[in-house]
Structures are given as C-alpha cells and as structure tokens.
C-alpha cells in the first residue's frame, strides 16, 4: 500500500446537489422546490413551531408555577471537599471562594455532610447540616453559623 493508492471508502465523498443549473441536471428550472406555494418562494417557509394555524403546542400546554423572588440560593460545599485545607485552619466563605470550591457566594454558603472529614477545622458558614456539624465536631473542630 502506498500513499497514492489510498482511496476514500464508497459513499464517503458525496457530491453536492447543484440546483438551478439547467434541466439536463435534473435539478434545473424549479430547483427541487416544486411549483408555486409558500415554500417555493425566496424567503418562504413557516417559522419554527408554526402548525398551520392550529393552536400550537406551547400555547396548548397550561402555565404552571412561579418564581419566588425571596428564594435563597446557597453555594453548597460537602464535608469531603474541606480536606484540601491544612489541619487546624479556619474555613469561611472567603477562603472557600479563594480555593475555588465556591464560584459565587450567592446568598451564603451551606456545608453538607457528604463524605469523610480527615482534618480538624474551624468552619464558619451561613448554614450547616446536622450531619456536617457532627462530622466536624467529631474531629475536634468548631462550627460557627454566621
């Protein structure tokens, strides 16, 4: 086998359909658009979601729910993520943001109890779950709600 003997597999190189180039091509005259009608015109066609005048699906379905403007969104950090901090250090929302565990503090930081904590830490957060508090205090750490 040599480089000049390489050949693309059958069907790999498909020829483009050149329309409007004479009747002999089979795609001349109306350029595969048929005769008259909205879809034959330039710029013709219906918008996405248009169902021919029938009530469209997105208007048939009922509206549901609302957005609570008072909802608090907390940045979530699990206990296992806190193992990156050195033993005996203080963990607060600012240090979490500096290390990249939290991108944005939002309405506060909540510590959840997923995983195993191997360090003794002083944790300050806006909310802390019971499991997380138990795991932190079991290692000799302190928990403070801001």
Swiss-Prot record:
* Alphabetic keyword roster: Ribonucleoprotein, Ribosomal protein, RNA-binding, rRNA-binding
What Gene Ontology terms describe what this protein does at the molecular function level? rRNA binding; structural constituent of ribosome
**Which residues fall in a compositionally biased region of kind Gly residues?**
42-52
Which Gene3D superfamilies does the protein's record reference?
A: 3.100.10.10
A Gene Ontology annotation in the biological process aspect, one of them, is: translation
What Pfam families does its record include?
Ribosomal_L27A
Does the keyword Magnesium belong to this entry? no
Which top-rank group of organisms is this from? Bacteria
Basic residues composition bias: residue spans: 30-39
| Annotated region (Disordered), positions in chain | 1-59
User: Which InterPro entries is this protein grouped with?
Assistant: Ribosomal_uL15, Ribosomal_uL15/eL18, Ribosomal_uL15/eL18_sf, Ribosomal_uL15_bac-type, Ribosomal_uL15_CS
What Gene Ontology cellular-component terms does the record carry?
A: cytosolic large ribosomal subunit
Q: Answer yes or no on keyword Cell cycle.
A: no
Question: What is the annotated quaternary arrangement, including any partners?
Answer: Part of the 50S ribosomal subunit.
HAMAP family for this protein: Ribosomal_uL15 (MF_01341)
**Functional summary from the UniProt entry:** Binds to the 23S rRNA.
State the PANTHER family in the record: 50S RIBOSOMAL PROTEIN L15, LARGE RIBOSOMAL SUBUNIT PROTEIN UL15M
Q: Which family is annotated?
A: Belongs to the universal ribosomal protein uL15 family.
Return the protein name.
Large ribosomal subunit protein uL15
Q: Which organism is it from?
A: Syntrophomonas wolfei subsp. wolfei (strain DSM 2245B / Goettingen)
